[in-house]
């Protein structure tokens, strides 16, 4: 039996304009459409495939999704549940606002401690809003578990997990004894689309809501005021312009060179 927890995150849609708030320079999540991060969809899909493969062999496992976020993050939870996850845990506390990756990793590690029987934690390699790529490793360190990161394949058998990590130097095969924490990249799979039946079933699935107090995290351990890293100054990116039009009357090449020099490109 493999009980899997998948870390998911609601992020601003990459097709929307993303910006920081004027006050504390944190990501303005209300200014853009919010979606379940695509890499998390792949993480959920991988967990479901492991569960389904084991079910063929008569092994019963479960898939739980875990997220930290505001009330709006429920939308991402329901998406994962509609794909086929069994239940969810939602760490919802205003004290988490502005937390850096270390604080987020600590809170999620504590939340994982409330989920009994966890044998495998699957996460995406990095979120599209922060692009830090370190939270899975931080969680593994806090929990004292082996970490296999940036995997393109996963295989679970005999109480062990094996996966391939592709780098510029080559492809490496990694192995660890469960329980373990892994992160996957975009090559791991193609996530399924939720069926109508799955969407309807998701509305009835269990979602446990936790606060910081319930996972044993003090308010002075997380949040923007206690973060080890924060944004101090933000400058909006310049508006797009139409550019400069060059009419070639025999000296087009010279005009292009002059333009590039003026822009300090060459």
From Swiss-Prot:
Q: Which SUPFAM superfamilies match?
A: Adenine nucleotide alpha hydrolases-like
Any one GO molecular function term: electron transfer activity
PANTHER family according to UniProt: ELECTRON TRANSFER FLAVOPROTEIN BETA-SUBUNIT (PTHR21294), ELECTRON TRANSFER FLAVOPROTEIN SUBUNIT BETA (PTHR21294:SF8)
Xref: PROSITE patterns: ETF_BETA
Gene3D superfamilies attached here?
HUPs (3.40.50.620)
Q: Can you name this protein? A: Electron transfer flavoprotein subunit beta
Give the top-rank taxon of the lineage listed in the UniProt record for this protein.
Answer: Bacteria
What does the record's cofactor remark say about binding?
Binds 1 FAD per dimer. Binds 1 AMP per subunit.
Question: What does this protein do, in the record's words?
Answer: The electron transfer flavoprotein serves as a specific electron acceptor for other dehydrogenases. It transfers the electrons to the main respiratory chain via ETF-ubiquinone oxidoreductase (ETF dehydrogenase).
Annotated S-S bridges: none
What does the record note on quaternary structure? Heterodimer of an alpha and a beta subunit.
UniProt entry keywords in alphabetical sequence: Electron transport, FAD, Flavoprotein, Transport
InterPro entries from the xrefs?
Answer: ET-Flavoprotein_bsu_CS (IPR000049), ETF_a/b_N (IPR014730), ETF_b (IPR012255), ETF_beta_N (IPR033948), Rossmann-like_a/b/a_fold (IPR014729)
Q: Name one Pfam family in it.
A: ETF
Family, according to the entry, reads as follows: Belongs to the ETF beta-subunit/FixA family.
What cofactor is needed? FAD; AMP
**A GO CC annotation given for this chain:** cytosol
């Amino acid at each position: 039996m493999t009980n899997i927890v998948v870390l998911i995150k609601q992020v601003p849609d990459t097709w929307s304009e993303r910006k920081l708030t004027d006050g504390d320079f944190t990501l303005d999540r209300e200014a853009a459409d919010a979606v379940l991060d695509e890499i998390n969809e792949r993480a959920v899909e991988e967990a479901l495939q492991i569960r389904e493969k084991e079910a063929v062999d008569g092994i019963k496992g479960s898939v739980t999704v875990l997220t930290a976020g505001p009330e709006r993050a429920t939308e991402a939870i329901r998406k994962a549940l509609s794909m086929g996850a069994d239940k969810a845990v939602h760490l919802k506390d205003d004290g988490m606002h502005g937390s850096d990756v270390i604080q987020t990793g600590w809170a999620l590690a504590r939340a994982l401690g409330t989920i009994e029987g966890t044998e495998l934690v699957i996460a995406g390699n990095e979120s599209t809003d922060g692009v830090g790529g370190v939270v899975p490793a931080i969680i593994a360190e806090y929990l004292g578990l082996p970490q296999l990161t940036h995997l393109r394949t996963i295989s679970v058998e005999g109480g062990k997990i094996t996966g391939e990590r592709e780098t510029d130097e080559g492809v490496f095969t990694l192995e660890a004894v469960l329980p373990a924490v892994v992160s996957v990249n975009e090559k791991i799979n193609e996530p399924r689309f939720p069926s109508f039946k799955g969407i309807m079933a998701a509305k009835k699935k269990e979602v446990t809501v936790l606060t910081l107090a319930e996972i044993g995290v003090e308010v002075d351990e997380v949040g923007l005021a206690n973060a080890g890293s924060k944004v101090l100054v933000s400058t909006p990116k310049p508006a797009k312009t139409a550019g400069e039009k060059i009419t070639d009357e025999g000296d087009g090449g010279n005009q292009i060179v002059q333009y590039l020099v003026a822009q300090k490109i060459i």
